[in-house]
Each structure stands twice: as C-alpha cells, then as structure tokens.
C-alpha cells in the first residue's frame, strides 16, 4: 500500500508531543507574522481618512438643537431619518 505512510502521518494518535508542539509553534509564528503585516498596513492609512463621513450626510445634522419634531417658525423638519425610513417602508 503506497499511501500507508500518509495515512499514518494524518492519524492524530501517531503524533508525538514534540510534533504537536512544533505544529503549534509554527501556527503561532504564522499568525504573529500575519498580525504584524496587518498592523503595518493599518498604520499606512490613517483612521481619519478611512472612516470619515461627509459633512453633509443625511444621517445627522450639524445644527442639532434637540428639536426633533421640526421648526414651527420655518416649517422645516430637522429629522432627516424620516425620509429614509418612509422610502424603505413604502
């Protein structure tokens, strides 16, 4: 049987303690290297540039005065989310 050695190598009972520790060490080294390369990539791009929302986004108002029902003087509604929700539910 030519594949007997392969079957024996893949059997969990044939691994020695040293072999398991070696495999564990290699996995730790691999994940450490992968983590360090991901950290270096994140340092090249600042979080401000990557996560910045546009100032005129419809999800918040820069002049938020706590009046969510609207402005009685101008008839203007400050709750911009209601437009998006009405589009979703209609």
Curated annotation (Swiss-Prot):
Location(s), subcellular: Host membrane
Q: Which GO terms describe its cellular component?
A: host cell membrane; membrane
Principal place of residence: host cell
The secretion signal range is none
Q: Where is this region: Disordered?
A: 55-90
Q: Which residues cross the membrane?
A: 15-34
Q: Where is the composition biased (Polar residues)?
A: 80-90
The record gives the membrane topology as: Single-pass membrane protein
Which spans does this entry mark as compositional bias, Acidic residues? 62-74
Claim: ATP-binding is one of the keywords in the record: no
Listed A to Z, the keywords are:
Host membrane, Membrane, Transmembrane, Transmembrane helix
- Disulfide bridge map: none
Supply the name of the protein.
Protein RL8A
Lineage per the UniProt record: Viruses, Duplodnaviria, Heunggongvirae, Peploviricota, Herviviricetes
Which gene produces this protein? RL8A
């Amino acid at each position: 049987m030519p594949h007997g050695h392969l079957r024996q190598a893949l059997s969990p009972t044939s691994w020695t303690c040293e072999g398991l520790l070696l495999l564990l060490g290699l996995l730790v080294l691999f994940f450490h290297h992968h983590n360090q390369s991901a950290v270096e990539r994140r340092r090249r791009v600042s979080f401000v540039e990557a996560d910045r929302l546009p100032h005129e986004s419809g999800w918040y108002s820069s002049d938020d005065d706590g009046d969510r029902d609207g402005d009685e003087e101008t008839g203007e509604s400050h709750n911009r989310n209601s437009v998006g929700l009405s589009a979703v539910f209609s």
